[in-house]
């Protein structure tokens, strides 16, 4: 009985240790369909999401500028909802690391600093060229395109990935969207392989 209990505890610890921690760059939070699906995946424990106030401010600022029809207050409400839903995801006290880092675009160093501070293994970003492996490998961090990241999530946790899609469809009410339309929207954000896997 004791051995079974130890095995159960060890199994739980191992399952927790294999959950990937990933920093979500502003450019993957910018498109609502992709942001929603990433958060639905996280809500089912497929991975642990990480962001900072600076990352949140960046996507909100850029989206508000590109879409003046969307009120900034609504976007900020989304940010607050994210912080409430994932209370451990908003990383702080990483700023002191920034000056020691080197990236092609110095303005991206705060993202890497957040990854280092949170011990994340992945930076999910659409701009892979801004996060070369030569700059990330010393910290045991890698950059992944959202399609690569989500595709990997589907491979590891297919049932949860499908459930996340179902939850996303159910949550969309204004206006409601069909499963096919949600998949089409996800594909338009660059999730080519991922959508193919979700359809198969």
State the predicted function of each range:
Residues 2-36:
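Metal-dependent nucleic-acid phosphoesterase active-site entry motif
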Residues 4-8, 128-200:
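Acidic, PIN/NYN-like endoribonuclease modules and their adjacent C-terminal/linker elements
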Residues 21, 32-66:
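PIN/NYN-family metal-dependent endoribonuclease catalytic core
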Residues 28-29, 99-107, 129-132:
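Acidic, metal-coordinating catalytic cores used for nucleic-acid/nucleotide bond scission
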Residues 46, 87-88, 140:
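A generic structural signal for alpha->beta connector loops
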Residues 50-94, 168-193:
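PIN-domain endoribonuclease scaffold, especially VapC-family toxins
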Residues 87-122, 156, 176, 191-200:
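Active-site neighborhoods of divalent-metal-dependent phosphate/nucleic-acid chemistry enzymes
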Residues 108-142:
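Acidic, metal-binding active-site segment of PIN/NYN-like and related structure-specific nucleases
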């Amino acid at each position: 009985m004791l051995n079974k209990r130890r095995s159960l505890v060890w199994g739980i610890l191992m399952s927790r240790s294999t959950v990937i921690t990933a920093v979500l760059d502003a450019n993957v939070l910018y498109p609502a369909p992709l942001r929603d699906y990433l958060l639905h995946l996280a809500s089912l424990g497929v991975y642990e999401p990480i962001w900072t106030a600076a990352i949140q401010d960046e996507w909100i600022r850029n989206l508000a500028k590109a879409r003046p029809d969307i009120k900034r207050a609504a976007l900020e409400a989304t940010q607050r909802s994210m912080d409430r839903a994932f209370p451990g995801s908003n990383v702080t006290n990483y700023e002191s690391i920034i000056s020691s880092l080197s990236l092609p675009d110095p303005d991206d160093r705060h993202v890497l600093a957040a990854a280092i501070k949170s011990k994340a293994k992945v930076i999910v970003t659409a701009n892979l060229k801004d996060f070369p492996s030569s700059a990330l490998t010393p910290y045991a961090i890698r950059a992944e395109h959202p399609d690569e990241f989500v595709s990997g999530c589907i491979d590891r946790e297919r049932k949860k990935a499908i459930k996340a899609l179902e939850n996303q469809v159910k949550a969309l009410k204004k206006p409601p969207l069909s499963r096919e339309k949600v998949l089409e929207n996800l594909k338009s954000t660059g999730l080519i392989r991922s959508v193919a896997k979700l359809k198969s």
